[in-house]
Amino acid sequence: MLLTDFDFTISLVDVGDLICGTLAPYPADVLARYARGEAGSRDLWLASFAHVDRDEAVALADRVDIDPGFRDLVAWAEREGIPLAVVSDGFTLYIEHILGREGLGHLPVFANRYVERGRLEWPNGNPACPLCGCCKAAVARRLKASGSRVIYFGDGSSDVYGASFADWVFAKSTLARFLEQNRSPYFPFTGFADALDVLRQNLDRFRDGTMQPRSTLRPHPRCRF
């Protein structure tokens, strides 16, 4: 099972931050609480994304390109019969729009929902931990419980939680630095073309579970279920 983050992993910019920064900047007090660890992404979204206009948000998202290697990864995974899903602490509003534009609208997406201005929903939230809107850890954990081996792709701080339940991790940026600090092995990548090379060359070992290095990251202390 391939499980990938969206913002700054599939997309070339953080679309959620672009939309909020342009249409409804995060309030300084909420940002300060977030920086101190007293608030989570859900608090940021409620203070900002909840107040954006749907059409304006989609118009901004439509200007964002995706990593061209992602299309190749999807095509390869489908030929090999490997399921692939997107997990994001952002919103289906822009994720599904961008994927649909790229002919990838059939991919499953685990993310938050913008219903209308002033109303957000958290279909993949974790009742035991309200910090994130979409609990990436719970999504990865559920896929593992169904019998899948999970290969995770990510870049950001929320990916720390999802990666902690993966068998293998492809990481860059903040996630890569966190894994290095915690001495957990990972595959570095700058784009999906890099990752696809590794997957193609080692598919049999990924399939039978013998591919090394496997992730040794333990569940994050913040993760509760």
Predicted regions and their residues:
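Alpha-helical substrate-recognition element adjacent to the catalytic core
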Residues: 1-113
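C-terminal cap/substrate-recognition subdomain and adjoining C-terminal extension
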Residues: 69-83, 90-225
